[in-house]
Every structure is written in structure tokens, then in C-alpha cells.
């Protein structure tokens, strides 16, 4: 265990040292399982300002096929967790619940690899058969970096929700959507520039 922590700290130090150069790194993607759920909990604690309740992790068991862990040098440095939902106007949607990257590894193309994975997954035959029509997520209105990031992947701002978040300032969020599998966006697009 001590050896693993030394390896993690060495890799984090390397990540911080290389971050200024922003060299792109390649993730090894792995499945989320009940056995490695504890690693995801630790990653989320390190990367998010809110603490996810145990129920969040219990619910993830239903959505393992839409979650991926990202490893660099055998250390968990990022993840994406999505769930499949019914849409009110028919078909299904994939909701991005969390996308996380450890701070020393940000701006290294890792989040892009995770988002590209879910975009590819949404276009798979299995998801087409499930009638997946869009991917969507919530982004805090002050998070200009995230807004610009998702727009690069074709997401559009379709709604602003006031007081969405609790114990975070500002509490408001935008809903970002991206149509999938030949479907059109069924929501009005708001003109929000990050």
C-alpha cells in the first residue's frame, strides 16, 4: 500500500511539473465495478466541491455500462459517470452525472477522451437500439471553462435553472444538450458565450 501511495505522489508530481507544457496524455479506460467503487469515491472527494451521498454510488450499479474510469500509469486520474433516462418527448437520453479529472492532470486532453468515449458509446448499435436521442448535463453558470469545453463537442445551452445547486455559489446552472443518432435538438438554444 505504501508503494502505491509513493507511485501516486510521483505521478502527481510529474503531472504538476508537465502541466505548464500541457503535454497530452493517453488514458487507459476501465470499467466501473463494485470492487473499484471506493476508488471512484476518493476521486470524487478530491475533485468536486460537494460530497456525493452513498445513495449516489449505490445507484451507479444500474449504470455501469455508461461509466468509465480513466487511468494514467495505473493510477485513477479521471472518470465519467452517466445514466440512461426516459425523455418526456420520447426516446432515451444519457445524462452526464459526473466528469472528473484530478487537478494536476487537467488540460491534458483527458476529459476530452472521456467525453469522446460517451459520445461513441451513445452512437453504438446498442444505444441506437435503445433509442438514445441526446446527451445532456448541468453546468454551473459561472463555470466558463466547462461551457467552452462542452461546446467544442457540439453541446448547446438550452435552459437556465435558478437555484439548482445547494451550498454552492452561484446556485444557478445551464442545461447543455447534444442530439445523437440523427435526431434534432428539440429545445430552444440560448445564446450564452463563455
Predicted regions and their residues:
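Short glycine/proline-centered loop/turn elements that form peptide/ligand docking sites
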Residues: 115, 143-146, 163-168
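Acetyl-CoA-dependent GNAT
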Residues: 14-16, 22-23, 27, 34-106, ...
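C-terminal interaction modules of eukaryotic adaptor/scaffold proteins
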Residues: 1, 169-179, 185-189
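Conserved catalytic-core motifs of GNAT/GCN5-like acyltransferases
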Residues: 136-138, 151-175
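Residues forming the Rossmann-fold NAD(P)(H) cofactor-binding site
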Residues: 112
